[in-house]
């Protein structure tokens, strides 16, 4: 098995290879499986936010209804793919935006809507719940929203999920690429150690089974 590493963060740095120094290629070259959540989820997050704004910040109920229609439409579009991913042993089906909101709600308020807002916390929790406890949280240097809902929640996530292995990486033209690489490789080293611990009982069981067959 390869260690699975999720990539989350500010939308440009998360998806654009030139902005994150080809992070996905780096992870794969180091023997990890990169897991990058859908771009569609960010659009659904924007639709979902209209509900909170209508209920708490004076936005019209019409906007809330339009947002919910948008969510239902996009979820319908990818429902066939989600069903097939659910049946597969090799792929993970994307979570519903309502599930992401429910995950995040225990840690940050849905009122955190600047930038990636609560959605970033929800994505990290989705990865942890689907077997990807190793996470790189990417952010532009001095990105205040990410410091609150990204780097700011890492301590709480580690407290609630002791097996989580999360590192926040700042990307900036003036930042040292060597420092970024060192932090990512340290995270991967921990990921490989944790994976070896998980595989140890399975290997013992297999060895015991082979011994019985030999006898």
Regions found by a protein language model. Give the residues of each.
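Functionally engaged cysteine thiol sites
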Residues: 44-46, 143-144, 201
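Short coil/turn segments at secondary-structure boundaries
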Residues: 2-3, 201-203
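A polyampholytic, Gly/Pro-enriched intrinsically disordered region
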Residues: 54-63, 185-196
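A charged, amphipathic alpha-helical module
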Residues: 1-99, 103-107, 111-112
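Acidic, low-complexity intrinsically disordered regions
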Residues: 192-197, 202, 210-211
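Hydrophobic alpha/beta core scaffold segments
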Residues: 16-32, 97-194
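Conserved small/polar residues in nucleotide/adenosyl-binding loops
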Residues: 213-215
């Amino acid at each position: 098995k390869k260690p699975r590493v999720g990539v989350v963060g500010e939308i440009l740095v998360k998806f654009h290879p030139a902005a994150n120094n080809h992070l996905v290629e780096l992870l794969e070259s180091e023997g990890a499986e990169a897991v990058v959540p859908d771009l569609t989820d960010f659009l659904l997050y924007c639709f979902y936010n209209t509900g909170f704004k209508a209920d708490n910040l004076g936005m019209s109920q019409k906007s809330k209804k339009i947002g919910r229609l948008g969510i239902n439409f996009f979820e319908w579009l990818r429902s066939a793919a989600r069903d097939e991913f659910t049946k597969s042993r090799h792929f993970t089906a994307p979570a519903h935006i309502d599930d992401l909101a429910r995950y995040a709600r225990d840690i940050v308020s849905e009122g955190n809507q600047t930038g990636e807002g609560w959605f970033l916390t929800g994505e990290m929790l989705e990865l942890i719940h689907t077997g990807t406890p190793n996470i790189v949280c990417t952010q532009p240097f001095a990105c205040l929203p990410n410091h609150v809902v990204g780097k700011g929640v890492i301590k709480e996530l580690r407290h609630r999920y002791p097996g989580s292995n999360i590192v926040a990486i700042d990307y900036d033209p003036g930042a040292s690429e060597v420092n970024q690489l060192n932090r990512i490789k340290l995270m991967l080293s921990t990921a490989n150690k944790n994976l070896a611990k998980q595989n140890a009982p399975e290997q013992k069981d297999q060895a015991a089974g082979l011994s019985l067959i030999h006898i």
